[in-house]
């Protein structure tokens, strides 16, 4: 290079981290891509590189501040000093998030310039530069983040290039040696890891995505890197449905009410601004009321529960049900939940049940807790009459769950590792979801349950284990199948892959027999043909679909980087066939003879031998399988408005969502009376009206899916000019949304503090009705209808929970009685995370959280 050449122009010493527009306006830039100011003013967000050239977010790797740790992905350390150069490659997946740079594949020196183009601002391999100069240290760290030094002499630049070329060659050699041993597993795993979550509010991501939806490049939005980036705080699955641009107006209205964006950005009409301010006040007031309601719900049981349960100390904490109440509730449990999840052996339970009422002090901890949990679970579907009675039942049942959790948490008692202890664990997890005691965080409790099951050898075929009787072998097979299904259900809700693979156990399916056909003295078990319905038929049908559902969860939340539509269609077709198989249980023939069981309980019928499947059992089985359909299609269903190819996914998701919240009516195959069939259907309705966990997830998935289908259909008709010509399908969707509004109202009255579901559904109806009246976004009438629907809903929900807070006073901890050990009958502890949630943002409606912590 000519030494007489004039020196290059001087560059800025400090890297220009703000975007060009913020520097021009002399305002603070949040350094996001795009930044909030550019989003608000609808201007292109452009960042200027150090060389003075202008690069947009689609073709430049931006330099950003990062952690001081040298092990951060994307940071290259220069040898011999503490200096470093760190670049953060831009994401080609839209504005959903950036991915950590993947390890480069092995290649020769001739392919090295492909790392960056010749005109790239950060191109360190410019062919016009000499690479033969000796290595010289010219890189200096920056207190605000890694940046290039101001030393730009030709010899220094050549030294930088030579040094980096040598280091790249060393890294490629190391990568080649690893790839030769592990194949392409390293590259595939690294490429699927997303960028660590930015330390900024979650609502900012949502508002930015929807405000810039019109400027997104064509193609699929919301890529896998974005899902991984947000997984650490988004504990539910249905938030991906919230990425649909059809919800942009509703989310913007909610953001303004929460004070996240300016009212002027939404509307300049004073009346609308006043309603927005009122809505924000109602949201805050409702949150405060919900916090007061939770004061009477301790998150941990008393220390005195370490004693034998029937002791007088425990009586201060647990309200033991009456014999008459316990008989009814336990019978309801065995007729409903025990069909799909075989946890208990009915004759054994009823024998222990009778012994307990004869001598309560002689009952073991496990038996006592089993009875309490069975009664609590059964009472969840009982007709209590009114909302106050439902709330009373919830307050009576939750202490039983706390008692079981405390007993299971003792790490020094080996009886927790017995079959009875595992049965208590399964019942406790089921009750937690039904009564919403940390039901949205049940995945974290499935790990200990699975590990305990592995420790006692439930994953091994009991026929190959020495000393295991036929009776115990059958109980172990049933319990293992139940635990596996609980694991896959919890994984679906937590956006997590299954905790184990299907090739890590060799347990055979349970036998198709009734409980009354085996006991401790049984030496030979002759199963019924699969065409005969027994008390195990529902679990066997559920178990047949387990490999498919495991595969769906692994496909959705595994480490692969992308989803292909043909694979989704294939899994969807197989899942539809599995649902058809489950529904065929209603056509199974009855047994040759009634296997009724007499357990000295008078007229109480406690048999588990059903002649045909009941409506509740059919609905529960269908629910546990069908709920996998919507998340499978969810990613593509959100794209159906812009890409008609994916309209099938929206249709399938809509059908599944409607089925989840619409229990099947009794059929002619059941032999019970019509009144009994109707009561069975009402049982499942009551479960959806009160339960949390996987049942609340189904409700949330249904409301987002059905609402999306309604908005997409209405907007399509508005564009095509058929909004007033073909209203039949739109009216049916509106009727479905109104049914969801009624269900959301029942949930609020029955103790749920999530008022945003009710508000969201009414806002959807208000938006569609405004479109039918000819209103369009920006004309004032559209915004007025949206805000009015939201405020009206918030007023109603505020009044409901306020009345509940006034009539159900919280516990006065200062007046609690203390026992001889100085411990209160129960301690307040921390609020359970299920009470308020992790984020007070709009996406908490679309995930598993319902309120934010104060």
Swiss-Prot record:
Residues 78-90, 125-145 have a biased composition (Polar residues). InterPro entries: Fungal_TF_Env_Response, Transcription_factor_dom_fun, Zn2-C6_fun-type_DNA-bd_sf, Zn2Cys6_DnaBD. It is found in: Nucleus. Induction: Expression is significantly up-regulated under xenovulene A producing condition. Residues 56-156 are annotated as: Disordered. One of its GO terms (cellular component) is nucleus. Xenovulene A is a natural product exhibiting little structural resemblance with classical benzodiazepines yet is able to displace high-affinity ligand binding to the benzodiazepine site of the gamma-aminobutyrate A (GABAA) receptor and could be potentially used as an anti-depressant with reduced addictive properties. One of its GO terms (biological process) is DNA-templated transcription. Keywords: DNA-binding, Metal-binding, Nucleus, Transcription, Transcription regulation, Zinc. It holds the Pfam family Zn_clus. It comes from the Eukaryota. GO terms for molecular function: DNA-binding transcription activator activity, RNA polymerase II-specific; RNA polymerase II cis-regulatory region sequence-specific DNA binding; zinc ion binding. Residues 146-156 have a biased composition (Low complexity). Residues 19-45 bind DNA. Transcription factor; part of the gene cluster that mediates the biosynthesis of xenovulene A, an unusual meroterpenoid that has potent inhibitory effects on the human gamma-aminobutyrate A (GABAA) benzodiazepine receptor. This is Transcription factor asR3. It comes from Sarocladium schorii.
């Amino acid at each position: 290079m000519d030494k007489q050449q004039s020196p290059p122009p001087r560059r800025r010493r400090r890297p220009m981290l703000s975007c060009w527009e913020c520097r021009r306006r002399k305002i603070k830039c949040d350094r996001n891509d795009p930044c909030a100011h550019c989003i608000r003013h609808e201007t292109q967000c452009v960042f200027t590189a150090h060389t003075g050239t202008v690069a947009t977010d689609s073709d430049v790797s931006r330099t950003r501040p990062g952690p001081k740790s040298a092990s951060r992905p994307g940071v290259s350390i220069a040898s011999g000093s503490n200096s470093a150069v760190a670049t953060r490659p831009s994401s080609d997946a839209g504005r959903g998030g950036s991915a950590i740079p993947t390890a480069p594949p092995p290649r020769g020196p001739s392919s090295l310039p492909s790392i960056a183009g010749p005109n790239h601002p950060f191109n360190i391999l410019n062919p016009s530069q000499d690479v033969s100069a000796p290595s010289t240290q010219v890189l200096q760290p920056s207190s605000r983040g890694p940046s290039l030094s101001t030393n730009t002499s030709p010899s220094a630049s050549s030294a930088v290039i030579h040094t980096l070329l040598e280091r790249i060659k060393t890294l490629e050699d190391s990568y080649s040696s690893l790839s030769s041993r592990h194949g392409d597993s390293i590259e595939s795993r690294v490429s699927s890891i997303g960028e660590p979550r930015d330390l900024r509010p979650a609502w900012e991501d949502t508002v930015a995505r929807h405000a810039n939806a019109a400027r997104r490049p064509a193609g699929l939005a919301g890529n896998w890197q974005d899902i991984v980036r947000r997984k650490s705080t988004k504990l539910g699955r249905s938030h991906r449905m919230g990425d649909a641009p059809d919800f942009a107006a509703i989310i913007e209205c909610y953001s303004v009410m929460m004070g996240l964006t300016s009212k002027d950005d939404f509307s300049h009409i004073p009346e609308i601004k006043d309603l927005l301010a009122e809505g924000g006040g109602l949201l805050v007031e409702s949150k405060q009321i919900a916090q007061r309601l939770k004061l009477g719900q301790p998150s941990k049981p008393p220390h005195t529960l370490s004693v034998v349960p029937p002791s007088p100390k425990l009586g201060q904490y647990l309200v033991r049900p009456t014999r008459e109440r316990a008989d009814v509730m336990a019978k309801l449990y065995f007729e409903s939940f025990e069909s799909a999840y075989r946890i208990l052996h009915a004759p054994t339970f009823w024998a222990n049940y009778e012994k307990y009422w004869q001598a309560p002090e002689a009952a073991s901890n496990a038996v006592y807790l089993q009875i309490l949990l069975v009664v609590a679970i059964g009472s969840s579907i009982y007709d209590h009459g009114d909302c106050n009675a439902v709330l009373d039942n919830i307050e009576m049942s939750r202490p039983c769950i706390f008692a079981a959790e405390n007993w299971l948490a003792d790490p020094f008692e080996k009886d927790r590792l017995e079959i009875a202890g595992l049965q208590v664990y399964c019942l406790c997890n089921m009750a937690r979801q039904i009564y919403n005691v940390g039901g949205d965080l049940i995945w974290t409790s499935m790990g200990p349950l699975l590990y305990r099951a592995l420790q006692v050898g439930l994953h091994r075929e009991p026929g190959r284990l020495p000393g295991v009787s036929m009776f115990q072998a059958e109980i172990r097979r049933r319990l293992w199948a139940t635990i596996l299904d609980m694991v896959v259900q919890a994984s679906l809700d937590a956006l997590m892959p299954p905790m184990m693979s299907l090739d890590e156990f060799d347990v055979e399916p349970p036998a198709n027999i009734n409980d009354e056909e085996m006991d401790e003295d049984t030496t030979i078990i002759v199963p019924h043909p699969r065409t005969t319905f027994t008390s195990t038929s529902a679990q066997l049908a559920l178990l047949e679909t387990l490999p498919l559902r495991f595969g769906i969860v692994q496909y959705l939340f595994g480490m692969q980087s992308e989803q292909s539509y043909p694979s989704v269609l294939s899994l969807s077709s197989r899942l539809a066939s599995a649902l058809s198989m489950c529904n065929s249980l209603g056509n199974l023939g009855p047994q040759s003879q009634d296997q009724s069981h007499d357990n000295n309980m008078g007229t109480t019928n406690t048999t588990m031998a059903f002649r045909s499947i009941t409506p509740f059992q059919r609905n529960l089985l269908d629910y546990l399988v069908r709920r996998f359909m919507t998340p499978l299609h969810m990613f593509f269903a959100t794209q159906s408005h812009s890409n008609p190819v994916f309209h099938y996914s929206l249709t399938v998701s809509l059908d599944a969502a409607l089925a989840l919240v619409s229990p099947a009516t009794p059929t002619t195959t059941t032999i019970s009376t019509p009144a009994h069939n109707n009561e069975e259907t009402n049982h499942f309705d009551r479960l959806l009206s009160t339960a949390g966990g996987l049942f609340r997830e189904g409700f949330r998935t249904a409301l987002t899916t059905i609402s999306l289908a309604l908005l997409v259909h209405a907007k399509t008709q508005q564009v095509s000019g058929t909004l007033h010509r073909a209203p039949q399908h739109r009216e049916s969707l509106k009727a479905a949304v109104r049914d969801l509004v009624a269900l959301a109202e029942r949930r609020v009255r029955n103790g749920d503090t999530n008022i945003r579901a009710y508000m969201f559904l009414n806002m959807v109806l208000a938006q569609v009705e405004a479109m039918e009246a000819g209103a369009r976004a920006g004309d004032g009438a559209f915004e007025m209808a949206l805000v009015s629907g939201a405020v009206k809903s918030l007023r109603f929900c505020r009044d409901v929970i306020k009345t509940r807070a006034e009539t159900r006073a919280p516990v006065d901890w200062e007046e609690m009685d203390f026992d001889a050990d100085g411990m209160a009958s129960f301690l307040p502890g921390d609020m359970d995370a299920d009470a308020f949630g992790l984020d007070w943002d709009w996406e908490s409606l679309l995930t598993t959280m319902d309120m934010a912590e104060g």
